[in-house]
Structures are given as C-alpha cells and as structure tokens.
Amino acid sequence: CPNLVFINDQPILLYCPQGLSKDVLDYGNIYPNMYKIGQSFDINNAALINPSPIQNLDFGFDCYATQAFNAPDGRALAVSWLGLPDVEYPSDRFDHQGVFSLVKELTLKDGKLYQYPVPAIKDLQAASQPFTSLSESKNSYELELNLAADTEHEIVLFADKDGKGLRINFDLKAGQVTVDRSQ
C-alpha cells in the first residue's frame, strides 16, 4: 500500500514494509506504518531523490495501511486502517473487524511528518442525532483538554477502586500520546 504525496513540493512516501527488521527501526506494530521524505522525486525512474531515513508514521499497534492523496487545494490528506487482520478482537464475534481512522491532514515540520484531524471533523460534531432504540451508556462522553505546552499529564478512565483503568498519557514535550490498557 505505498502512497506518494507532496507537501510544499516535497515528496513523502508512505508505506508498510512488512517483515522489516527491528534492527532497521524499532516499531510496535506487526505491520508498521512508515514514511520517507525526499528532497525531490524523479518521475522517470519513480525514485525519491536524497530520501530521509525511514521513520515511524504512527506508533499505534493497530494502525496500518495508510492511504494518502493530495486534495485539489494541495493539502495532503490520509486515512489509516485501524485493526489488524492477524489479530483477534472482541468485535470479531459480531462479524466486524477494523475501521478507518479519521481523515488526517499531513504537514511537515523540521523534517518530521505530523498528522492532524481535518478541521471539517468539528462540523460533524455540531449536529447530533439521538438514537432512541439504543440503550444509554454511562461510559460515553466527549472530553476536550487544553494542556499547556511542554508539560506531561495523565488521565485514567474506567478506573476501579484501586485506580486501575485505561491510562492516557500526554507528553507535550515529545509530542506523544500513550494509551496503556495493561491495567
């Protein structure tokens, strides 16, 4: 599933190199999402000129097969597949496995590729449609966080009396969000 997009005239090759040795680059997914940034692209030989080293696009363990394209306005947009075919999920018993991610806009900054949900996602949140045939869940909500730059934070969801639950860590210095389901 290789994809080539351009950001500010720089070619970005996105791909999932199955079987890549972790000696080349450490990753936590059996089908890693990777990318290289080229200085330019040789269309006659289908080659990146002066490519960067291979880099992780996504550190998630269930995310792969990113599909990207340049929109008519020039933005580089992408969606990724969430859920791996070789992994069993609780939803398998309902004949459902996997889903596409939100549409993301890709940007370059200091030689790294960044992914941000497209702003149009907010337009979808404005309208609500109640489903009267569904039972209400007390574990569903939307949480908007405003965190100061260069800080670290943790929230724990669905915690039991011992504080064990789904831990979400925000490291704004490193630009990483970590989800820990081990407790």
Report residues per predicted region.
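Hydrophobic core segments of beta-strands in well-ordered, beta-rich domains
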Residues: 1-5, 10-23, 76-82, 86
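Acidic, glycine-rich loop-and-beta core segments that form the ion-binding/anion-interacting portion
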Residues: 7-8, 20-42
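Beta-rich accessory regions
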Residues: 31-183
